[in-house]
């Protein structure tokens, strides 16, 4: 069965969302058209405004409507000499929710991937190098994902930081809290063993 051109365009547009296939997009489109036109209009308006108004923080590259994001504008954060480097804005939220980190961030918006044509400049590493050169950071925490690409990106940034005499640390990877060893995969267990630390009593 063929849908009207506009209905088909709506379905195709919804398929751009991650994890949304043809069937899911069709259900969403029908839900908006049949039962929630007001919600659909609000979604369309908010989406249009977000696409126009949301950009990147000039300092950390996180999403913001201002020149600097809320974290970079914080007087307490401005005094910090610790920089945490993450791949996505979602990683910033995850770390902030722990309540354990009070430094600054740098959001790469991805990771190095030569196959996909993503190089250092695409991740803003030229901006990062300039920040290292100012001497404002005493430590950089590499919080990229424990994937092949994430590790390659961390290694590249570590070499960059080393050129500017910045101390480098990497977030620990290992056994999840509440997990049982027999169910942990070999790579994770290997990371946990190599990253072990002394036990404090």
From Swiss-Prot:
CDD domains: TOPRIM_recR. Pfam families: RecR_C, RecR_HhH, RecR_ZnF, Toprim_4. A zinc finger (C4-type) spans 57-72. Keywords: DNA damage, DNA recombination, DNA repair, Metal-binding, Zinc, Zinc-finger. Residues 81-176 form the Toprim domain. Signal peptide: none annotated. SUPFAM superfamilies: Recombination protein RecR. Belongs to the RecR family. May play a role in DNA repair. It seems to be involved in an RecBC-independent recombinational process of DNA repair. It may act with RecF and RecO. This is Recombination protein RecR.
